[in-house]
């Protein structure tokens, strides 16, 4: 059985991967633009492959994956919470999702949608060592995702060969839900004084700012403000 040919027939581009989940090709960019040929699929299957990755994005019919990572050891907890909220609010949406479990006990929610984008980090947190990890991220245009039947991967619901399309609104619901698990907000730089806010590096001088402000006030006065 050649999974690469089956994926091709389902309109999904794919790549062979090694045990470290890395592509077993010098380049796979061409597979972001077209499906592999039957001949290429045969080569992939005979390439001493370890597993299979699906190429996300337009080439695969706007395939996108929500990846619940287990780096922080809480993937199952997050996954169960997400599933509960989807089934309680959008059971029809839940039934459309292909769901798989990864070798490191992470989870993938797989779907197609008219609207997708590049990969995004939806929920992050900082661990005890101060390192920032993404608990939930997407695999979109320009990315790939390792899937079943790669060793160690399990199919929980449905088959990726029959992946369904969800609506744009349903995708937004999923994203909002995932964003609610975010525990890390990137700190934005704060200016300690006015002079720092208008530094020479920024291309603004304090004098220039005052001149522009005074010019603006003069204009307002001319118009009886």
Where in the sequence are the language-model features?
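Conserved phosphate/metal-binding and DNA-contacting active-site motifs used
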Residues: 1-203
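N-terminal structured subdomain of primase-like DNA metabolism proteins
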Residues: 191-225
